[in-house]
Each structure stands twice: as C-alpha cells, then as structure tokens.
Amino acid sequence: TDVLDNRVAAQRSGPFRPVELARDVPEATLVYIKEHPDLFPGVEAEVRSERSYPLGELAAHIVGHVGEITEEQLKANKSKGYRPGDEFGQEGVEAAYEADLRGTAGKRVLEVDAKGRVVRTVSVVPPTSGNDVQLTIDVDVQRVTEESLAQGVFAARATKDRSGQFFRAPGAAAVVLDPDDGSVVALASYPTFDPAVFAGGISEQAADRLYNDADRPLFNRATDGGYAPGSTFKLITAIAGVAKGAVRPTDSIADGTGCIKVAKQPFCNAQKAIFYDTNLTKALTVSSDVYFYTLGQRFDTQAGLDAYGIQKIARTFGFGSSTGIEIGDSAGVVPDGDYKKKLAAGNPDFGDPGWRTGDNVNLAVGQGFLLVSPLQLANAYAGFASGGKVYENHAGAQAGNRRHDA
C-alpha cells in the first residue's frame, strides 16, 4: 500500500537495515506473524523495550520524557550509534542524562546471498542496559508538594477577587531545596502530565490534549516561569540597603501617611496601611512597602550610593542567571537601564526608555520589570538560610556541590 511504501522510503538507510512498519501491535497479531513467516516474507515481529514510569505523574517535570529522536538530534549524535526511530531524552532528567541512561544497542551480523536473501546469522551482540541515575528527590516530600499545589489551585479557582470574579489560577509551582548543598528535594509544577504517554510514541489525540491545553501542563513553571516576586524580594532590598550604606538596621523611616511620592506619583502600602516609624526588623515583619520604596528611591537619587546596588546584590543571590540545574531553567530578568533601553528599541509605543526613580522604587518591592523563577527564589532563600552560601542546584545525586558566597 501507499502507506507502507512511504514508511519504507522515509526510513530506508541501507539494504539490510530493518524498517519499522508499525509499533504497539496487538499481541495476537505479533504471534500470528511469528507463526506464519511464509505469509510475511521479510517481515519480522519483535518485542522492544519501552521506558516505564511506575510513579506516573509524580515528579514528571523533573523526570521529563523520551520521544522519537529528531533529525537535529540525530545529526548531533551521529557518531553515537543512534538510528532513525530511536527514543531520545527530550526533557528533564531524561534529556540531561541521556548518555548515562541509554546503554548500547545490540548488533546482528547476517550473511546474504547474491540476491540479498539471508543465508545465516554470523554473530549477535546483545544490547546492554543503561546506567541508573539516582536523584536527590524525596518521593514522599514530592508527593505532598504536588498534592498541596493541586489543592491550592482548586481553592484559588473557588475564590473570588475584589471584582467578584473567580481567580483564573491556571497553574502553580513549588520548590523544596536542601540549603546545605542546593540539591532539589521536591520540585513541582501544576498542572502536570504522565510521561508514559510519550514512551513508544505519543498518539495524536494525546499530543493534541497536552500541547493545546491552555493551562500548559508540559510547561515547567518551577524552572522556566518568570514572575514578579513581590514582597518576597524585600529581603534582597534589605541586604542591599545595609551592605551598600543606604540604611542601618536600627534606622527608622517615617511612615505617617502610608505613601511616598516619587515624581508626583504616590506609592503606597497595601490598603494604604500606616506603620509610622519603621526600622528594618519592623519593615520585614509587617512588609512595609513605604520602607522599601524609600530604599529604592535612595539608591537612585542619593549621592554616594551605587545606583544599581539592589541589582548587584540580587545577582549575587542568583537572580538574572541560571541556577545550574541539569534540566535547564530560565535566567529571568534583573532590570536596569540597559535592559529598559533594549525593550524600548524598535518599539515606538514603549514610552520612556530611561531608567527612572519609579523603576527603582518598583524593583525594591519585587515589581516592575523584575522576573524570577520559583527555583531562583527558593535558591536565594536557601542562601539566606545557609549564611550567604548560594549553591548551584542539581537533581542528580552525583552532581558536585558548586557554590559561591553572596
């Protein structure tokens, strides 16, 4: 038939290299072909190994999935024995540790006659299994983390905002790290998926569901998402303020109205709360916006201070760069004047391309152009917990403890 002819033509790379005509064949069909070789000359039915995921959806965004090797991957790994149709790690640990997990393919040498018919099997080299890769994930913690995420999303979707509309809550992410070495204890992104659907080739229906789902179950929000960290960033601003000389821990900043003005624009506490005289400890305890707005303003306007002091401290805690995790992640954005100019370039509707005091004020409370991933934020807080030691993250137990001091 045309379908079979097309498959043979697409995969044929040599006169004696087998062409895969079908997979996931029913067992009854497999047995029938084996029992009636005279009816199917040149056709062999064989059982192939297939990746199994006994934990199902658990830790799917860490584990990742395999899939049929792409043309680009085939070219890049030409010398490693890969063939069209082979499975290849596409995401997560499956991709990061492909070389360890794959093993080696088997080999069969055949003798053929002048007409290309097989006369005998000369030799057979059996395939070998790949290596085990031990992860740092605690399965129990991972399970609780994923269950809590799902419950949180469902609760949010059942909650109305100030306008009376239910929250959209398309997804969520959570990360648990060991602050002593940066290893990942749990990392979850919701919604998730079952990597088993990719093993042996994903069906069109399953692919349509996964790739077209508006809530993006394949997207790892924990590592690749970029979000404004909000008040969780205030500790970075506090460290910058003290380290760069913008404030002393015991200094009080007056807050008599719940707002400050920057270029005639009011910047206020949530619900315009008033906290009166506020030192650093109190500012962190009550999450005073006015206190941190003031620090952001000082960095931009006060003579003798490093105008990008907050940005520099943020980068020492890992914001704006990869965490080093093997499965890949987003660097995020620590904005400054150069970044804003790049955004404005070629965009006549962008507005003011200069870095203004208001930009720094927004940055000080984790807003504006600042974007971080949940993993970056967790790693920064692990750095706080370990006395300023910021490690590169890893999910593989054999990874080294790479760190720097913030």
Describe each model-derived feature in a short phrase.
Residues P18, V118-G171:
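Conserved, well-ordered alpha-helix/loop/beta-strand core segments that scaffold catalytic motifs
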Residues T1-N131:
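Small/polar-residue-rich segments within soluble enzyme cores
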Residues V112-V124, T128, I137, F167, ...:
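Beta-lactam-recognizing serine transpeptidase/beta-lactamase-like catalytic domain environment
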